[in-house]
Amino acid sequence: MKKMIFLIAALFMLAAFAPTQAQTFYDMELGGSVQCTHQFRDRGFVNVGTDLRATLPVSEWSRLRALVGVNGFVPNGFDRYGYGMVGITAEALPFYVFGDFGLSCNPSGSHTIGLAFDAGVGLAFAITDRWRLYSELAIDRINSGKLWQSTSSVKAGAMYRL
């Protein structure tokens, strides 16, 4: 299963370097999503959160976009986690793959600073010349002090091209 995921991700990365004829996503985009997150160690918990992001094209001749954003969610009703992220998105529209990393913080618990990693696949549909809707499936690894947490997320959101 892991080999299949890596193979699909590699194909999207190769498609990202193909020259584009019409850069419909050449401008900066701003957007956000609502997410449902499940912690692997706490079976049965389904958590909610938000994701705010901006993307910029890396070059005129590739489908790579730089990703900067903030992700936050409530994993168990008591603690809140958030992390800033910097990453890359490879688009072969309507599909794309992404990966990012950043610093995490637990503002309601131990106030620890840790690391966060996020990777996944997404599907985006243009609804106007400036708006597009997207949905993502992601795997997150978040360090909250001494403990690494693994979560899976399903996100649905919208992006606006400036």
What are these regions (language model features)?
Residues 58-66, 94-97, 125-133:
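Repeated loop/turn-to-beta-strand initiation elements of outer-membrane beta-barrel proteins
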Residues 1-27:
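Cleavable N-terminal export/targeting peptides
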Residues 21-73, 155-161:
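Short glycine/proline- and aromatic-enriched beta-strand/turn motifs that initiate or cap beta-hairpins
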Residues 102-134:
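A mid-sequence interfacial segment
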Residues 34-40, 56, 70-76, 90-94, ...:
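Transmembrane beta-strands of outer-membrane beta-barrel pores
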Residues 26-28, 42-50, 78-84, 105, ...:
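Residues that define the transmembrane beta-barrel architecture of outer-membrane proteins
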Residues 28-34, 66-70, 86, 97-101, ...:
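Membrane-embedded beta-strand positions of outer-membrane beta-barrel proteins
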